[in-house]
Amino acid sequence: MSRRHSAEKRPTEPDPLYGSTVLSKFINKVMESGKKSTARRIVYNAIEKFSKRIKAENPLEAFEQALENAKPSLEVKSRRIGGATYQVPIEIPANRRSSMAMRWIIGHSRGKAGRSMEDALASELSDCYNNQGTTIKKKDDTHRMAEANKAYAHYKW
């Protein structure tokens, strides 16, 4: 890695169907082994099933709402001070929030055995939209952990 210049952040291309950069990032996270067309098909079919399940007029807005509900605002990071390690709560930057939410949704969808990825993803998105399910539980656990360690917030760096 060069010490002189940091890499330029390339703009994300919007997805072809909805024209959303957020959805494009989500598709890229679902993609495995470079199979983008397969990832697109899975995500588009999952969003279609999800929007029918919740009877949404605009599937993209419903998807973004589900993602918004899954975004954490606080997390804990380990900080070593004088031989002791403290879990210090910190606020999460916006790009990391959405990245974590996407990873959690996809991870919990992959963990649902015996279903197609489309069905599992649609189910997880509808759970997030309704503020329930494993992804929301993960977010609440993260917030609870940060709340429990609020006493160490002054160790922020």
Curated annotation (Swiss-Prot):
The keyword Glycoprotein does not apply. CDD domains: uS7_Bacteria. One of its GO terms (biological process) is translation. Keywords: Ribonucleoprotein, Ribosomal protein, RNA-binding, rRNA-binding, tRNA-binding. One of its GO terms (cellular component) is small ribosomal subunit. SUPFAM superfamilies: Ribosomal protein S7. It comes from the Bacteria. One of the primary rRNA binding proteins, it binds directly to 16S rRNA where it nucleates assembly of the head domain of the 30S subunit. Is located at the subunit interface close to the decoding center, probably blocks exit of the E-site tRNA. Belongs to the universal ribosomal protein uS7 family. Part of the 30S ribosomal subunit. Contacts proteins S9 and S11. This is Small ribosomal subunit protein uS7. It comes from Protochlamydia amoebophila (strain UWE25). The gene is rpsG.
